[in-house]
């Protein structure tokens, strides 16, 4: 093969093996596997996931959600705090596609509750150490405010809590990755237990490639969302 311009070259076999290994780990731990289509923003690579039974995906933007919805995906989470300026874009999605948005403040909830007309799933973003966005896990008074606000909008359905331990990428060893992962799990499990009586079907969505690759402990989690494990482009 002669390459005369910048070209993405993949070893398809290795990528598919990586996908199968992560899918098998999710099955082994009875977890929903909702991979983050972050690096592999490709409808074709998306079909590799479908071959191992993946039906739900994660993306980082409304535009990518639209791209994959047009490619046939029917259950998509946009896993960053939602930009309220994009409400009109959400209304353009077909009701055939289940959409989940992520929030971390009441202003966002009130805005989407008023401006978004379609049925929409809502995850509350929790900070478990990365400190980039989200509500601190122990601030249940703030979480309660969001839940009360959410309850005012019948077309918005609270799904659960979502976190991303992005600081595992700065870890210097597997041991440090494990420590970060376990700390995050404990914090999310605390919330799951705290709200169990109010929301018995509460989802706990976690997922970064380092933790999901190394760990065999997913206590309390219901869903994993690793992304760049497909290429391991760390």
Labelled PLM ranges:
Residues 128-234:
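Active-site loop/helix belt of alpha/beta enzymes
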């Amino acid at each position: 093969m002669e390459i005369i311009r910048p070209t993405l070259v993949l070893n398809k076999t290795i990528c598919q093996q990586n996908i199968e290994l992560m899918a098998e780990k999710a099955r082994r731990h009875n977890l929903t596997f909702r991979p983050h289509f972050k690096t592999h923003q490709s409808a074709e690579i998306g079909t590799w996931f479908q071959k191992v039974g993946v039906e739900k995906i994660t993306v980082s933007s409304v535009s990518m959600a639209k791209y994959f919805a047009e490619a046939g995906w029917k259950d998509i989470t946009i896993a960053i705090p939602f930009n309220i300026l994009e409400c009109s874009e959400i209304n353009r999605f077909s009701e055939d596609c289940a959409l989940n948005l992520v929030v971390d403040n009441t202003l966002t909830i009130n805005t989407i509750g008023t401006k978004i007309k379609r049925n929409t799933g809502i995850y509350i973003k929790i900070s478990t150490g990365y400190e980039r966005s989200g509500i601190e896990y122990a601030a249940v008074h703030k979480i309660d405010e969001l839940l009360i606000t959410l309850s005012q909008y019948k077309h918005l359905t609270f799904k659960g809590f979502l976190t991303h331990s992005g600081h595992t990428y700065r870890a210097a060893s597997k041991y440090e990755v494990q420590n970060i992962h376990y700390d995050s799990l404990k914090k999310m499990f605390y919330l799951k237990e705290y709200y169990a009586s109010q929301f018995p079907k509460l989802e706990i969505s976690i997922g970064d490639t380092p933790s999901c690759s190394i760990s065999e402990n997913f206590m309390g989690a219901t869903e994993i969302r690793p992304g760049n494990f497909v290429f391991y482009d760390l």
